[in-house]
């Protein structure tokens, strides 16, 4: 496993888990620092000791062979694997040259020793200095916080206000130092991948020049040397892009940290001081607490952020009630009492501020929970995958291929933003009919046209390859076997919504044509992947982990461009159909719970957005036109339309494949609390509707009770968490494939279809 990413949002929570992750990075930096010192020492011995050259080589080679790179993330790219393997390759080369005793090269000190010493002092040393500053500020902040918490509420309001201001200033300063430290740690960990290996590569290249006996060995090494050089350059290029992204994210976090908090499974979490009664008096112990409103479960872990602080034993409380403490009833400020179901005594807790106490009270007193207040990462744009959208992309592609296919830096050189917006406004003008495929006037520069194409794709409400399948595409790129990557991506492409797949086909055919002219325009498949990866697979949440996955986004786009004919012209070998999978699940349901892969995917489209989408796309096909124009008609006509669509799909095998893997784009959107008027997806106890079923014979879904066969933990706010044996009320098929809707403890939510049986 690689090193875990350090999120900037965790600097504000400063949780025990964050401290543990930070400590693992610090240990890795210490190991790297010690290893570089040892490597420099060994290198000097190798240069100075001609008589002991063989012994020095063995030690040096042994040091290289023992060190293992640890990259950030749970998988490595081909370039990182190549770089990580390079030390073992170097050691093997030195082992083969062990018997050759020739004097050291004159410039080895400049080639090898100086860069490593420079990296150790300027990068690793700088990280240590920032660490000292971080530890010092952490100590000061915690000490001041404890002192502040002990202030009596009977003091004058002016003094209390002044103390609050001082604490807030200290806290902000601590957050800034913490952010800078995390940034520096990430930077050093990334830099060592090229600034550390590159001097070693240069040193070995110098050895080959002076060793006549190693000429043949050098020829054998040249292929790996070339591959490694490319990998180092690719890693360096990615580092430059990643660093700018991370710095930009850090600046956004600094300016408004509350808008960039990471999504959390907890309703509320943070530090609280808990009053503990002793034999002589009481004491206040700092705990990191988390609370889940659905289960009314509160978890407390004793922890102090001071250096060397140990994590205590976890304690779980099932909440019964939460009452605010009156100011006059206790000397401490910001206090409230918590009563547990399984605890005989009441716990008194102290929040860090009045605002913090209000948040805890709102989370625990039965009011509406305060979930993540982040703004949507992507506001609804005017761009859509409708006739206008396809027309705009086709016009841009036609202009590029007829006028600028050989321009150097195509798609990499950006146009002037004002010109780009002007061209997009012109192309998106509703007065211009989308059926009119007029060419873009020659007055528009190619870089303006290419920037407009990229901007339009970024303006879509979601990325072209969808948020739903983003993690699946990334996982496919992380597969070790290239054939497996291609096969998995091929399947995922055919699971995309039809319009997304059509647009992706149009774009990839064009990019393959651009790559075919790379000798003139210098835009290779790799360069196009760098340009379009973040656009086609943009993350739903802007985090450090998402930035680290950019390299895999690029790999996905490269694979699609290189294999675009196979990706879009052939249908992949799809897994079992929905009905077969349903039957197999029913057979195995008595023996074991469904695996994670059997858990259906949810789309989480809101009624509002779907209606807007259907309205905009109503001109695309006669079937969609029928659906949108009759959305408010009776249940009879609605079911007739559904039956007609089933008959239409039965005549087209391609549509059958699409239907088995994604929801029907024509499905209506009933309210969350009312059953659908058309049985698009049947309950487990009823047979799956076939394409030949007429509207008259289509049964209307009747809400029933269902019992959970297995426990399930919700992965989204719209899902329900439950244990085995739980009984649900008012259960009926959902518009989401593989899901049911039901009511549990007064809350309506989604339930996996293969996790329950009807009563």
Swiss-Prot record:
Record's keyword terms, sorted: Cell junction, Cytoplasm, Cytoskeleton, Endosome, GTPase activation, Membrane, SH3 domain
UniProt biased composition (Low complexity): 618-637, 679-701
GO biological process: signal transduction
Highest taxon, organism lineage: Eukaryota
Species of the source: Xenopus tropicalis
Ranges of compositional bias, category Basic and acidic residues: 608-617
Transmembrane portions of the chain: none
Ranges annotated as biased composition (Polar residues): 638-650
Protein name (database record): Rho GTPase-activating protein 26
Chain positions of site Arginine finger: 412
Cross-referenced SUPFAM superfamilies: BAR/IMD domain-like, GTPase activation domain, GAP, PH domain-like, SH3-domain
Gene Ontology, cellular component aspect: cytoskeleton; cytosol; endosome membrane; focal adhesion
Biological classification of the source: Eukaryota, Metazoa, Chordata, Craniata, Vertebrata
Location of the region described as Disordered in the Swiss-Prot/TrEMBL record: 578-701
Pfam families the UniProt entry points to: BAR_3, PH, RhoGAP, SH3_9
Protein localization: Cell junction, Focal adhesion; Cytoplasm, Cytoskeleton; Endosome membrane
């Amino acid at each position: 496993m690689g090193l875990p990413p350090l999120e900037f949002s965790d600097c504000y929570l400063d949780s025990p888990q964050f401290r543990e992750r930070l400590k693992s990075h610090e240990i890795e930096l210490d190991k790297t620092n010690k290893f570089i010192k040892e490597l420099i020492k060994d290198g000097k011995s190798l240069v100075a000791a001609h008589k002991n050259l063989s012994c020095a080589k063995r030690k040096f080679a042994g040091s290289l062979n023992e060190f293992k790179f640890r990259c950030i993330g749970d998988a490595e790219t081909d370039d990182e694997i190549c770089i990580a393997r390079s030390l073992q390759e170097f050691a093997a080369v030195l082992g083969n040259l062990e018997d050759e005793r020739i004097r050291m090269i004159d410039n080895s000190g400049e080639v090898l020793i100086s860069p490593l010493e420079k990296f150790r002092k300027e990068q690793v040393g700088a990280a240590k200095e920032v660490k000292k500053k971080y530890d010092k500020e952490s100590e000061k902040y915690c000490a001041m916080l404890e002192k502040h918490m002990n202030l009596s509420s009977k003091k004058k309001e002016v003094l209390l206000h002044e103390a609050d201001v001082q604490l807030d200033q200290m806290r902000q300063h601590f957050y800034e130092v913490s952010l800078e430290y995390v940034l520096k740690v990430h930077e050093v960990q990334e830099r060592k991948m090229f600034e550390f290996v590159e001097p070693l590569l240069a040193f070995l290249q110098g050895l080959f020049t002076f060793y006549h006996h190693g000429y043949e060995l050098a020829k054998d090494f040249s292929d790996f040397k070339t591959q490694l050089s490319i990998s180092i350059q690719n890693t360096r290029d990615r580092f430059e892009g990643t660093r700018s992204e991370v710095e930009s994210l850090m600046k956004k976090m600094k300016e408004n940290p509350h808008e960039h908090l990471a999504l959390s499974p907890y309703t509320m979490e943070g530090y609280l001081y808990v009053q503990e009664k002793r034999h002589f008096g009481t004491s206040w112990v700092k705990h990191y607490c988390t609370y889940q409103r659905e289960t009314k479960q509160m978890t407390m872990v004793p922890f102090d952020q001071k250096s060397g602080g140990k994590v205590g034993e976890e304690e779980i409380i099932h909440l019964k009630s939460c009452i605010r403490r009156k100011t006059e009833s206790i000397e401490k400020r910001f206090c409230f009492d918590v009563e547990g179901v399984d605890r005989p005594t009441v716990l008194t807790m102290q929040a860090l501020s009045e605002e913090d106490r209000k948040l805890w009270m709102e989370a625990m007193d039965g009011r509406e929970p305060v979930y993540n207040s982040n703004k949507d990462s992507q506001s609804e744009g005017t761009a859509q995958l409708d006739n206008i959208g396809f027309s705009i992309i086709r016009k841009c592609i036609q202009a590029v291929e007829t006028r600028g296919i050989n321009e150097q830096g195509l798609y990499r050189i950006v146009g002037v933003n004002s010109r780009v917006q002007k061209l997009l406004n012109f192309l998106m003008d509703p007065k211009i009919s989308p059926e009119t495929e007029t060419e873009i006037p020659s007055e528009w520069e190619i870089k303006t046209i290419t920037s407009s194409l990229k901007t339009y794709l970024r303006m879509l409400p979601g990325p072209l390859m969808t948020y739903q399948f983003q993690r699946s595409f990334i996982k496919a790129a992380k597969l070790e076997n290239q054939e497996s990557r291609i096969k998995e991506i091929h399947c995922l492409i055919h699971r995309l919504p039809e319009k997304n797949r059509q647009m992706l086909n149009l774009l990839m055919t064009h990019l393959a044509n651009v790559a075919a002219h790379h000798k003139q325009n210098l835009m290779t498949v790799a360069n196009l992947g760098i340009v379009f990866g973040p656009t086609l697979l943009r993350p739903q949440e802007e985090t450090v982990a998402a930035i680290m996955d950019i390299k895999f986004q690029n790999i996905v786009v490269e694979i699609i461009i290189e294999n675009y004919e196979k990706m879009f012209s052939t249908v992949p070998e799809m897994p079992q159909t929905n009905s077969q999978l349903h039957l197999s699940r029913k057979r195995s349901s008595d023996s074991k719970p469904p695996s994670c892969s059997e858990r259906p995917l949810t789309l989480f489209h809101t009624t509002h957005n779907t209606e807007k989408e259907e309205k905009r796309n109503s001109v695309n096909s006669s079937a969609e036109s029928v659906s949108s124009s009759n959305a408010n008609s009776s249940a009879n006509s609605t079911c007739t339309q559904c039956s007609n669509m089933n008959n239409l799909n039965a005549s087209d095998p391609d549509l059958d494949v699409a239907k088995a893997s994604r929801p029907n784009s024509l499905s209506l959107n009933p309210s969350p609390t009312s059953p659908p008027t058309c049985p698009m997806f049947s309950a487990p106890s009823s047979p799956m509707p076939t394409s030949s079923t007429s509207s008259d014979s289509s049964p209307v879904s009747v809400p029933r009770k269902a019992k959970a066969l297995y426990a399930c933990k919700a992965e989204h706010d719209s899902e329900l968490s439950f244990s085995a044996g739980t009984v649900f009320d008012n259960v009926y098929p959902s518009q989401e494939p593989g899901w049911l809707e039901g009511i549990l403890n007064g809350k309506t939510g989604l339930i996996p279809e293969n996790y329950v049986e009807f009563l």
